[in-house]
């Protein structure tokens, strides 16, 4: 290496060391938000003068109070203007309004999302004086007794509050004042946020808690020079609470949690290189973050499900997704209402698998397309007549007859045939590979009372008896048992795998070879029992309570299974669905309601100016990161100023990471996707766009001419965003009259704002 290169390297290295030392010594700010954001205000003063006279400082303090109020007022207007002109159930209000009704009726239901957002919908109904008696049928007119406007206003407040949070986030990052205003304007005048914010949906709640999580995360980062101080603990705990609320609305909250987790790992890894830090302090950093960023969010998540279970105390549409004992304790449930002991022949039962996510043993007339080509046997998560079975005597003995008067109770260790009530087929297995789990045997419906073989015979093995009833009998709900094939020696089991489309994506049932004894996939219980010949259940009989944590895990697994089943149907065209690449490019939008001339119409589409610009900014910032890495490898040190480095991290790098975490999963996932899935990722793209303005135009503030040009660019782009929002405002505020009146908004053939035949 030449002497000049060597000298350059040593200077750059010294500058890098100096930068690290400066970063360690950098102080954060005081407890109030306005004071904690003062570093951004100090940076703003450079736009005007190197000196900071008292009058200018007063103006900045006044700005930090007045502008958030103005921006919030504008946000309330853009989210709530004409919010009630469409008195029909719009888009997914049909789902989430109905779920809110279930909370007011206390009826148990099942959905793919965690409960916090839907409980807030229920709260909005309660505050609006609604009694929960309506089920929000899609497209129907709201009844007079339901104040849907108040419910929508409640939801819109979450969307509106994202705007002041964006303002404070920009200040916390350290953006200059023009950039703070720009970022706030980008969020304020975003058509997609304004459109979805006015309906009874979860998206605005999800966005609010996501924005709150990132804001509190940045504020916590700004306290890094004062670890374990009151402000440090405050923002750590607020971050944890915000993360817990985000994931409690939708599982998409895992993405922002992952971003904070990556930051935390990098932070702790950096501390490990600090020889001045004692091991005790280092371990305390670990413990504090485990508590604040793992335990606190998990407790929030857990608490939401506890409230969910406590509120939904009555039987409802989602009962079958839960364990049998859980269902039995729901008010009005028919589970466990039958006689206590199971009898041969006369007892018609449904049989529930006890694995996490277990379903009811089921069969139907459709046959396997391969293998034996016999009748399918599956597990099904919903109540159905095809879930009903009865026990008959083993093959070779006389079949049970309705003329028999003596009651013969089922006993463990005895061999029986299990007969499907509606088709008369015997539960059967044979040495044929199962359709999905090829190492296990297929289970089918085969034969009848005449046709069959010894592979129809199954032995009941009791594994657990809850209660003090006769241990030698099979009891409804409280007896856990295994079902062993006498001939093959394998056990009836639900694998957890879903069958293909020919099996209606129901759960696979197999005969499992050599399972371990505690494998709950082979454990079953009687869920419902009908038998008029037996005495009813004693009135004073009480089922044992279920374990909350087990119910919590069971429900979450059922939610994941339902979510994974939301895959596109190749035989059907879903005109509402879209691909991830179409979102940042605005290739498509989404009609949110019927397109008749008589009703106001809404079209979900981002503000073109900001969405396209943010997409370009993401690509530009990616290229910038690559260039900086190449220069760093060649011993060049950029971003020497600690303030610039901090803005780069909080305003560019971590928003890019958050954007990727919120966007890329939808690129690779197999489930059906829609335009609104991009809304959280769009927020981080807007932050990156603001950073590109801030960093790209920073040097222009050094001269008077540069400051003028900088002002023109900021003002011009903000005017473009506002103008674009207003131009497309009908898609957010409601398009009244024929859609042909708005065909001027159809910039591209893929936008179906106006009907194609009218365009």
Swiss-Prot record:
Location(s), subcellular: Endoplasmic reticulum membrane
CDD domains: beta-trefoil_MIR_PMT2-like
Side of membrane Lumenal, spans: 86-167, 220-251, 311-609, 669-676, 732-759
Modified residues (Phosphoserine): 32, 38-39
Biological role: Protein O-mannosyltransferase involved in O-glycosylation which is essential for cell wall rigidity. Forms a heterodimeric complex with PMT2 and more rarely with PMT5 to transfer mannose from Dol-P-mannose to Ser or Thr residues on proteins. The PMT1-PMT2 complex participates in oxidative protein folding, ER-associated protein degradation (ERAD), as well as ER export.
EC number from the UniProt entry: 2.4.1.109
InterPro entries: GlyclTrfase_39-like (IPR027005), Glyco_trans_39/83 (IPR003342), MIR_dom_sf (IPR036300), MIR_motif (IPR016093), PMT_4TMC (IPR032421)
Protein name: Dolichyl-phosphate-mannose--protein mannosyltransferase 2
